[in-house]
């Protein structure tokens, strides 16, 4: 009997820990998987252009699920990769990207912003039209 209670307690703990990670609806999880695949395709082009091995992720916890179901996140996120490609248009830029940029994280925010620390570029944006690529490019050119 005690063994069953321990198993139940462990199972309940596992479910409680796993729920936040899997709290998104099936529709949202499918959309996220598709958008991550789209971002991965774009990342292949960026890495080919730059001769780099940058990794990219979308921090889904920072986006409103209903809003991200209506408006694709990937095109906004791709602005950061476009900015990196622009910087790679010459050898100095390629070398700098390869030496310094290791990851790109796209996150939701009220206003667009870029930050860079320890090889990690974080690009935050809302899902409304704006000049994301320009913001990231200007930021990287001044910060790298």
Predicted regions located by residue number:
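Extracellular distal adhesion/interaction modules in secreted or cell-surface proteins
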Residues: 42-65, 118, 128, 140
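Bacterial N-terminal signal peptides
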Residues: 9-18
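Auxiliary, metal-adjacent structural segments of Zn-dependent hydrolase domains
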Residues: 62-129
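Short N-terminal segments immediately surrounding and downstream of signal-peptide cleavage
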Residues: 25-42
